[in-house]
């Protein structure tokens, strides 16, 4: 029998169709010779299927449908949630962290539909209706181009994006011109003065301009890479800590020959007498006797100051944590004691302070054995008071600049941040312990920058440290508090760059003012520093989420500091330029008002948990306003006194009970106001008038008499107490707030009790009201 597959196929003898059941029955012997003979049609079908599935025919096979992805590349890589926001053009996470979002290139239709639904596209069409003249670019069919422009919303949207990108480009070019002017001015100055070589000056200019102006303009669907985003091909990943450094090898030899571990009972007993060991044992006894109190106070500190301390930390401690980390437990406890009302824990604080002081001072000798928790404790000693001002004769005031510098260097020595950088950027491993160490580093960096700038100890920051500070933004666990710290570091770095090249920066600001490029207008008459204004725009979204507005405190504080430094350091130049002096004074005054008004909006609970530096900013703003009180016209003087007195009222016993955290600041501000008012008895101010052109001349004459406190502009708030004691015999003093039920009654009595000489400051306003 012919068994060729091409043989004719005979139908079934019974005439029935070949059903599925029939085929399944014959499938058992499909591969046998017998099945091929009896059912040649099955062999033909099998051959057809084999030919269909052959590699030659795979090209005609329908491709497999690819699963649609709804998350961007960055969020998908870290496996986190991705919420696309059509109005912004990128997902929420990439927008907050300022990263490049791949959805910006794939969601054009969704963005356009959102604009249509919101009605924004109609507004764009009406605004850009006259842009139809662009049709002359297509000379072949102008009418067709015009009609398509009017009907197609996509074209209008593209024109809108083009206008937006052109506006952004113009702003970028304007800032570029400012940079070039600064470089040219600095180059001229360095050429005229042979103090430094031209290479050094150009390097300094690069630091102050290029480092502070880091262009981050966003346009359309393409986004220029932000500073916080890394390019792996441009990274400097070769940095590492030497495993066999010379001094480490010598230290290991010394440790082997003269071991620090005790080997005998006498040595163990002597080791227990070391100051650090004694301090730990003594605090452990205090903790065992007051365990519940320590847990309560530690929780109060962690909850009340959660906005200011390291983000993402614990909210309470337990026995195991306390025994493992005695130093930081003692710091939690003693800081919370200053938050208590009416000196509730004064007796316990007297006992606890010597123990904390010994633990803190002995960290210098325990440098090699410090842990991250110990360094975190030193950080909080920099940020908050651990001693009472009323007991200053027994309890020391520690220098926060020295402590923060020591803690920062200790952390860089103890933790290998080069390994962390390699894990995060190359291996993309996000370890919670690494995140904790980076958060300590960022908090220490922000604290050190604030105190170094405020103390006038200006130094250039390490570039590698800046790279470490940015690593937190790469973690999926990063939160709002981490963004706050990064923005604080960025602001401090900008201001630090300004003060490094202060003379050149002042010359550039003066040149911008003379050329009407100072960024102000006739209504506000405020000088806009381009670097600080850039920071404000760059972190605009983050500032909008900061309900308390605490970030703007430091922003206003640096404005006040820069303006006051201009007045004190370049007074001879400002004497010859009255308009620029008035502009700087007005800028300093408005930012002082902004800082004080922002403070008045804070709830009392947040004020009590605020760190020392926030209180320093508050006092400095009041001190500056009172120091330059007589440089303002009469109406502004009344506003200054009213606002400073409101701050004193806010910090006093009305609405809050007396406590260490707020009462001392209120006393300092009260002393500043009293001192500024008693100065009216000295000098000759009766000849003052409201002529703004003579403002600086009168102020300088008054300063020349040696009576104005502004003659010593570098005076710190700590000196105010001494000046206040010298003037304590004056008849005018701010009345006690306990005598009044409201601020209006208090301030009315305060104003009525002014001396006749003091009331002369406001006579012009009263006469004006009477005439009207």
Swiss-Prot record:
Biased region (Basic residues) positions are 59-69
Q: Which GO terms describe its molecular function?
A: DNA-binding transcription factor activity, RNA polymerase II-specific; sequence-specific DNA binding; zinc ion binding
What is this protein's function? Answer: Probable transcriptional activator involved in uracil catabolism.
Q: Which domain of life is it from?
A: Eukaryota
Q: Cite the entry's keywords alphabetically.
A: Activator, Cytoplasm, Cytosine metabolism, DNA-binding, Metal-binding, Nucleotide metabolism, Nucleus, Transcription, Transcription regulation, Zinc
Name where it mostly resides.
Answer: cytoplasm
A cellular-component GO term for this protein: cytoplasm
Question: Which ranges are annotated Basic and acidic residues under compositional bias?
Answer: 39-51
Q: Which residues bind DNA?
A: 72-101
Protein name per UniProt: Uracil catabolism protein 2
Q: Which organism is it from?
A: Saccharomyces cerevisiae (strain ATCC 204508 / S288c)
Which Pfam families does the record match to this protein? Zn_clus
Q: Does the keyword Nucleotidyltransferase apply?
A: no
Q: Which SUPFAM superfamilies match?
A: Zn2/Cys6 DNA-binding domain
Tell me the first and last residues of the signal peptide: none
**Segment Disordered: which positions?**
1-70
- What's a GO biological-process term for it? nucleotide metabolic process
Family, similarity comment: Belongs to the URC2 family.
Q: What else is known?
A: Present with 937 molecules/cell in log phase SD medium.
Gene behind this protein:
URC2
Q: Where in the cell is it found?
A: Cytoplasm; Nucleus
